Amino acid sequence: TGSFTFANTAAFLAGNANGFTSTLGDVSTAIAQGALGLFVQDNFKVRPNLTLELGLRWDWLMSPTERYDRFAAYVLETNSLVRVNNGLAPIYQTNWKNFQPRVGFAWDPFKDGKTSIRAAYAILADQPVTNLVTGNATNPPFATSVALPITIPTTKLSNAITVAVPGATVSPSSSDPGFENAYVQSWNLNIEREIKSGLAITAGYFASKGTHLRLTRNLNQTFLNAALVPTRPFPALSPTSPIAPGVPLQNITFRESTGNSSYNALWVTANKRLSRGLQFNASYTFSKSIDYNSQSSQGVTLQDSNNIKGDRGLSDFDARHRFVISGLYELPFKKDSALGGWQFSAIVQLQSGNPVTLLAGNAGAITGGAPAANANSLTGLATLRPDVGAPITISPVAATTGNGVQWFPNLVCDPRPGGSCPAGAVAILPVAFVSGKSIYHFGSFGRNTIIGPSFTNTDFSIIKRTKVGENKIIEFRWEIFDLFNHANFGQPGRTAQVGSTTFGVITNTRFATGDSGSSRQMQFALKFKF
C-alpha cells in the first residue's frame, strides 16, 4: 500500500501520477522493556511537635529490546545507520543512576495543634514508553519509507528494499543512542492555620523542574545556500554506513532527551468541615508553566530544529489563575418533616485561558534556485510561525461575526511583490526579505504567545431525602451542569493566511456538546434505599 502524488488537479483526473510513496518491509515488532524498582521509606518523631520523613527509591529502567534485534539507529557522529547488536548495543544506554530521594517534615511550631508547617522535596524518574524506539524498527533493512518517481525500472516486490531505484531516498526515524531518562524535581512549602473550630486556611508554594525531557528534532532540516538552493546538511548517508551506504537522505526524525520544563505556583485554600449543615472548600492558584514541548508524540513540533530555545514558552496547559469553590448546605429542619432532608450543593470554577501558538499558512514556494519547494515541506513540519506585525489587542468583549467570535484582528501581510499587506496586519508571512532576514526564514512569533478565552462553569444540585418507615429512604436528585448556560469558547483559529475568514476566529466551544462545561444540561434521579 502507499499513496500517489499528482502535479495538479488535471493530472489527478487523468490518472497521471508523478510519484509514489510507500513503506516496504515488515514493520511488525516484538518490543519488550524491563524495569525494577526498590524503595525504602520511614518517618521519625524528632520531637513531639516535629516529624521527619525520609525515603529513597532506585529504578533500573532497562533499554527496550526487540526479540529479533530488528532495530536500526541513526548515529549522528558518523552519519550512518547501524543495526543493534551489529555495531550498536543496546538501542540506548540503560541509566543506572536513577536514585530518587524524598525528604519532608511536618512541624507544629506553637505546640497547640492549630498551626502546621510542612515542606517536602523529591526526585521522580520517568520510564520512557516503548514508542520512543518503534521508529527504529521502520528503518532499513527491516522496512523503509521510499518516495519513488513514476518512471522507475520494474522490479519484484520481494526485491523492493534492496534494489537500486533511481530517485529513491530514505528518511530515518531514530532514538538518540545517548538518550537519558527524564526526571522531575518537586518541592513545596505549606503553612496551615486553624482559624476556629472546623475552619482552616492553608497558604503554600509548589514548584517542579523537569530535566532530560523528550524532544523530537529533524536533524536534516533544509536551509537555503548562497544560491538560494534548498540544501540539506546530510545529502546522503555516509559511504561507510553499515546500512544503505550513500543512499540520499530526506528528513531525519531524531528523538532525544534535551528538553526541560518548570512550574511555579502559589496557592491558598480554605476548608470548612461540615457543621450546622454547612461545609465548603475553596482554593485559588496563581501559577506559571514553561516548557519546550507539551506533547509526547513522536512527530517534530519545534519550529526550528537547530534552535531548541526558540520554542521555549508557556506550556499548552498553562492557566495563570484558577479559582474553585465547592460547598454543601442542608436546611436546618428535622429530616422527617416536610422541609427536612433538603440539601443544596454547588461547584464553581473560574480559570484563565490557555495559550495558543500562531502558525503561518500558505507560506508559498521558495522562488530562488531549484527545485522550488514549499517552506513547510523543507523543514519536515507544519508549525512554521509568522513574523510579528502590529500589536495584537484582544477586546474585553470579542466581536461576533457571521463566522464566529473574532478574538483578535485577522489582518495578515504577504510582503512578496504583488502580495497583499494591509495596514495594521498582526502577522507577516515569513516568505520574503523582511527586516534583514532572508527570503526563507523562521517567523519571529514566539510559541504560545496568545492567550485564549477563559473558562467559567457552575454546577448545582438539589437533593431531597424522605424517610419511609424505620429504615427506608427515597432520594430525589436534580443536578444542573453549567447552571447559567455560560458560553465557554474554544481557541481561536491560529493559521495566518491572507484573506482568511477563520484566523483569529472562534468557531467552537471549549468542550464538545454533551460534555461538562459545554452547555446547560440537567438530569434527574430517583433512588430507593432499603
Name each region found by the language model.
Residues 56-69, 120-128, 206-209, 285-286:
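Short, solvent-exposed turn/loop segments enriched in Gly/Ser/Thr/Pro and often Arg
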Residues 62, 114-151, 211-217, 345-357:
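Surface-exposed extracellular loop regions of Gram-negative outer-membrane beta-barrel proteins
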Residues 88-97, 151-154, 312-318, 326:
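A short, structured beta-strand-centered segment in the mid-to-C-terminal lobe
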Residues 32, 49, 61-63, 157, ...:
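Short, solvent-exposed micro-motifs at the edges of structured domains
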Residues 10, 14, 18-20, 142-176, ...:
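Acidic/polar loop-and-plug regions of large Gram-negative outer-membrane beta-barrel proteins
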Residues 67-70, 132-135, 295-297, 492-493:
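Short, glycine/charged-enriched secondary-structure capping and boundary segments
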Residues 1-110, 298-301:
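Signature of Gram-negative outer-membrane beta-barrel scaffolds
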Residues 53, 114-118, 337:
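Surface-exposed patches in mature extracellular/periplasmic domains of secreted proteins
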